[in-house]
């Protein structure tokens, strides 16, 4: 009987173990990807029903409601983490790269071709050495997901003649899907030679384009994280016509006087989340321009630089649109601007449905600014009748100090005044504790909570606080 009992126990265990394993495996693989939660942004889309009115054909509250279309961003790895351990590894050294300061461009081209043509996911490995690389395009589409693991330093050539074929780009990822670029290494644009030859540094020189250090163009499902990008020739990182992007844990640095060295530039891109980045450059820490929507920015440290900017928009009488932007959680120190919207006269289109919240300013020259008369040229810009419409912009929980006596500037168009602008719990003062001013022209404004300074028409009295 004892033997028979043991036999039955063995049969039961044998039957149960596969079922448990199958059930566990199913549970692991069938868990849906985790959505970004509303609480993560602190963005209550129903918070302003009483004083944001219907503008045009759309209501601001409904246009910013919690929908799959708005919050299409997901905390997913696009399947890359699950297969990373089993990926094919392609080492640039195996293709002739030396990492000794001599030109390794050809080796990088060959290694990329091998990784991109792999039918299984691949890891392109850049070891901990210093690799000199001339302008290069990492072009797709690739046959499978790909990770570029950068442990070392990729350094740009400082010979400007190397950029004759394409003077606007250095490293380009073109038309790649399911891409990760990470590893803790450094991308060094070696930009000093370009800054010295900029018309902004020496006005006697002609104005010419300089390369963007790292460009992602027409790419989808992109993760860029854990990298240092420094001393770009011009813009450091550009996401151009991309969809579904996560950029996180990036350190972006260049000298304060380096011209046009924007940190992260977003153009024509949808569904992008920029988080946990430290940026200090000679231009905008983050710039968001035409064609961008569903942009989420949080946990940013900015300075030196020109702040976090939407625009410029409408240059050369062009049409431009930016919408659905949330900046939640930023610290700006010693920057020329804090949170800024800038548009040229003569343009058309709109910058709409935008929220800046939980922003801390320290000695910032222009903490809050909307400038519909932006003019970045030596000659005065001609006054024009058309403008990019700025509407439905919320500033919530903005606190700190300014380096000038004006903390808030709304310089809006006479013909296309700013509409649906909201200040809620804004407290800004001059460094040292003195009261600051707010100058406001042609703006439809509401205030709620404690707001200081109050808005006033330039040369006029303070507006009454909204009930």
UniProtKB/Swiss-Prot annotation:
Enzyme Commission designation: 3.2.1.15
GO biological process: carbohydrate metabolic process; cell wall organization; fruit ripening
Active site per UniProt: 283, 306
Compartments, record wording: Secreted; Secreted, Cell wall
GO molecular function: polygalacturonase activity
Keywords: Cell wall, Cell wall biogenesis/degradation, Fruit ripening, Glycoprotein, Glycosidase, Hydrolase, Secreted, Signal
Catalytic activity: (1,4-alpha-D-galacturonosyl)n+m + H2O = (1,4-alpha-D-galacturonosyl)n + (1,4-alpha-D-galacturonosyl)m
Position of the signal peptide: 1-27
Main location: secreted
InterPro entries: Glyco_hydro_28, PbH1, Pectin_lyas_fold, Pectin_lyase_fold/virulence
Glycosylation: residue positions: 290
Any one annotated GO CC term: extracellular region
Record Pfam families: Glyco_hydro_28
Similarity field: Belongs to the glycosyl hydrolase 28 family.
Function, in words: Acts in concert with the pectinesterase, in the ripening process. Is involved in cell wall metabolism, specifically in polyuronide degradation.
Protein name (database record): Polygalacturonase
Organism, scientific name: Actinidia deliciosa (Kiwi)
